[in-house]
């Protein structure tokens, strides 16, 4: 089943992101996480690449198992960094041969410590990868792309950033998943601009529950997400109390999701950081909202 078809059939699409363990860590660890996530009945699970494709060999394997072992639709991340057309074709062929026909096309991050000195590969930007995939595989695959409600960290012009996003959609992207954010109002303004720009593919909202002090420092460094005062107060209050910070982070993410569902978003994509217990808590918190989402006329419909 293609993810674009899931968006057409369901009022609210609920999904998770996981990442492969480092190559020094046994794969069994991620399957323990998946055992728990399966019971939460996500509509699909995405599987990331490491920086510079550092878990490249593990991503297709796990994506295949999500689909065939766990019976959950799988979205395999594919990045441009150091990727050749030949390598990309091999990966996509493996995925298609094993029932995975959903790909999230991303530029990706350079290998750690090699931001200014690495082999770029055959695709410079995500749009180049999207064009290649669509021309090569046509409608046999469903292609997702990334959207940046606060603009890409490397682009300081939001209008230009939106123009690039529109081009990416025109090149063949079927749906979008947003970068994480902590201020819903910024997202709503982004949605208004996207509508005006004619971006009409489904947009799923990326939400990351912040449950540790180190996590937020990495987030701000990597993606530049702005922190509203409400969020900053939580960090200051509970930064030195790990259990309290986790509880507050789960509550904050839940509050974001409740508001986003009320706004009428098409999807919620939870960045789990492989913490199944956090995903379970949030899923439980919004279970009633998932089961019956009000349509614009106020009537309840199954999600």
Where are these regions (language model features)?
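Active-site-adjacent beta->alpha loops and helix N-cap segments on the catalytic face
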Residues: 1-6, 25-27, 53-65, 84-90, ...
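Active-site/ligand-binding-proximal alpha/beta "capping" segment
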Residues: 132-177, 251-263
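Active-site mouth loops of central-metabolism enzymes
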Residues: 13-29, 74-86, 142-160, 237-251
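Active-site pocket-lining/capping segments in soluble small-molecule metabolic enzymes
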Residues: 121-148, 196-250, 255, 286-303
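Active-site beta-loop-alpha junctions enriched in small/polar residues
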Residues: 18-21, 48-52, 77-83, 108-109, ...
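Conserved N-terminal beta1-alpha1 strand-loop-helix module at the mouth
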Residues: 1-47
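Conserved, mostly hydrophobic/aromatic
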Residues: 17, 45, 95, 168, ...
């Amino acid at each position: 089943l293609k993810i674009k078809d899931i968006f057409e059939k369901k009022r609210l699409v609920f999904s998770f992101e996981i990442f492969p363990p480092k190559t020094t860590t046994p794969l069994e660890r991620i399957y323990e996480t998946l055992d728990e996530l399966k019971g939460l009945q996500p509509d699909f699970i995405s599987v990331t690449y490491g920086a510079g494709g550092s878990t490249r060999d593990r991503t297709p394997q796990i994506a295949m198992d999500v689909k065939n072992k766990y019976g959950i639709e799988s979205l395999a991340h594919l990045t441009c960094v150091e990727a050749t057309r030949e390598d990309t074709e091999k990966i996509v062929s493996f995925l298609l041969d094993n029932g995975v026909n959903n790909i999230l096309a991303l530029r990706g991050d350079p290998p750690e410590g090699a931001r200014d000195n690495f082999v770029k590969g055959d695709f410079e930007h995500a749009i180049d990868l999207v064009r290649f995939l669509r021309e090569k595989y046509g409608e046999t695959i469903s292609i997702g792309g990334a959207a940046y409600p606060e603009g890409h960290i490397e682009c300081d012009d939001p209008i230009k950033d939106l123009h690039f996003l529109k081009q990416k959609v025109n090149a063949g992207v079927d749906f979008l998943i947003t970068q994480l954010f902590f201020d819903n109002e910024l997202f709503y303004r982004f949605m208004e601009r996207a509508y005006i720009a004619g971006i009409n593919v489904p947009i799923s909202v990326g939400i990351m529950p912040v449950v540790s002090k180190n996590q937020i420092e990495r987030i701000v460094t990597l993606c530049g997400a702005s922190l509203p005062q409400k969020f900053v107060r939580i960090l200051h209050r509970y930064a030195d109390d790990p259990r309290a910070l986790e509880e507050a982070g789960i509550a904050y993410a839940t509050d974001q999701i409740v508001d986003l569902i009320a706004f009428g978003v098409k999807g919620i994509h939870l960045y789990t950081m492989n913490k199944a217990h956090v995903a379970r808590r949030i899923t439980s918190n919004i279970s009633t909202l998932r089961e019956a989402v009000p349509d614009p006329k106020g009537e309840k419909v199954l999600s």
